[in-house]
Amino acid sequence: MSTLRLLLSDSYDPWFNLAVEECIFRQMPATQRVLFLWRNADTVVIGRAQNPWKECNTRRMEEDHVRLARRSSGGGAVFHDLGNTCFTFMAGKPEYDKTVSTAIVLAALNSLGVTAEASGRNDLVVKTDSGDRKVSGSAYRETIDRGFHHGTLLLNADLSRLANYLNPDQKKLQAKGITSVRGRVANLVELLPGITHQHICEAIQEAFFSHYGERVDAEVISPDNTPDLPNFAETFARQSSWEWNFGQAPAFSHLLDERFRWGGVELHFDVEKGHITRTQAFTDSLNPAPLEALAARLVGCQYRAEVLLQQCEALVGDFPEQEAELKELSAWMAGAVR
């Protein structure tokens, strides 16, 4: 019986693909070597310990229907579209070795006519007249008895969109995370015109089989043809939840300030695991009571635009004379945290 397993995803859903990856990694026999090939439609994928409000322009993502997905490995934020080919290599220890999986990807690129090399811990680069250009980035995860290496190959990605979603608004945001580094990148199609996702997948599969000296049939998976994995539904529910994608953010503080015709407002939020733990409100309004009441109501709430909007509008019954001001405040506040 082969120790290899090959999975190809027909789904562009990042939550589905990451849930498949997580399930297989947790449940695979320690003797198995797995290759999983996939790609995501418009998605910002963040590292396990990152703060989406710091790393991403969450407002623009919502406007453009770009999903947020938190992966289980560390590292920085990346933008995925269908111009990215994603790969995951998994193996039990002591066989797991990220230099092996890196060598497989380099061999695949070489078979297509692209000479690349590893650079630093995470990247693959090609040398051009204008300097080294990054064509692949990776992240890793290890447990006591297994590990995985996953990454992307830039095939024909819309590189102009990287800045759209990975450059946050210039908010007064103080966070305990580390800002991702945006390096110089290149698409493989610039080096090999006409190359496709299928070409890359076939090359990686062949390099995978060649390295291990055996072949297996591919398992093609999708939401309509899910792999036989215990607890997959629960894993998918977690992967697609707000609590995982946003709520796992490191603790941070956020300052909002604005001047309205009825007075200036300054709000200080302390946020942990996606929930507001402390709110301070300052205003020169002649009637500060609604803002003081709002500050008290928000403690314990999820740091979500719709939740802040609901809490603010709920005060109208207590302060009917300030209804117009509260509606103006709620619209501004919700827009500021998106």
From Swiss-Prot:
Domain named BPL/LPL catalytic is located at 29-216
SUPFAM superfamilies hit by this protein? Class II aaRS and biotin synthetases, SufE/NifU
Please provide the Gene Ontology terms (biological process) for this protein.
protein modification process
Which terms in the GO cellular component ontology are assigned? cytosol
Q: Which residues bind (R)-lipoate?
A: K134
Q: Where does ATP bind?
A: R71, G76, A77, V78, F79, K134
Q: Which UniProt keywords apply?
A: ATP-binding, Cytoplasm, Ligase, Nucleotide-binding
Q: What is its EC number?
A: 6.3.1.20
Involved pathway(s) = Protein modification; protein lipoylation via exogenous pathway; protein N(6)-(lipoyl)lysine from lipoate: step 1/2; Protein modification; protein lipoylation via exogenous pathway; protein N(6)-(lipoyl)lysine from lipoate: step 2/2
The subcellular location is:
Cytoplasm
Pfam families with a match to the protein in the record: Lip_prot_lig_C, LplA-B_cat
Q: List the Gene Ontology MF annotations in alphabetical order.
A: ATP binding; lipoate-protein ligase activity; lipoyltransferase activity
Q: NCBIfam families from the xrefs?
A: lipoyltrans
What family name appears in the similarity comment?
Belongs to the LplA family.
Record text on subunit structure and interactions? Monomer.
What job does the chain carry out? Catalyzes both the ATP-dependent activation of exogenously supplied lipoate to lipoyl-AMP and the transfer of the activated lipoyl onto the lipoyl domains of lipoate-dependent enzymes.
Record HAMAP family: LplA
- Return the protein name: Lipoate-protein ligase A
> What organism is this sequence from?
Klebsiella pneumoniae (strain 342)
